[in-house]
Amino acid sequence: MDEEFEQYLAKFYKGYKGMQLFNSISESYAKSFGLSYVNFIILYSIFTTENCTQTIICKNLSLPKQTVNIAITYFYKKGYIKLIENPENRREKTIHFTEEGKKYAENIILKFQECEYKTIKVIGLENIETFIKILNSYAEIWQNEITKIINK
């Protein structure tokens, strides 16, 4: 590898450490409410997704079906969610908050979203859009390169 590439890679890893820090902060936030990080992001997904299903959560969060099922069962047993059969697909159930669950989720998620809002406001929407565009491009190219190696 050439020296210039190594410098860029070092800069990239500094950015990657920033993403890891974001996840670590989010995990600490979740723990302050007695939740695992995974249960927190699933709760967040239910809160922000209309007619949410386990399939949607698995797809959006890239989580295994079993992991999502365990979290859904946890929230169900706590009385925070109810599962309603989808009339269009009887094998699928949509996830809805109970009154208690809605209060529980609002207490956790709305505070977190307020922090997100304040952060985005400081950084600026244009910078956020650029960041997302670059991150998605990088991920797509990287996935293609890794797939080439895997499929050899």
Where are these regions (language model features)?
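N-terminal leader segment of winged-helix/HTH proteins
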Residues: 1-33
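Residues at secondary-structure transition points
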Residues: 6, 13, 37, 52, ...
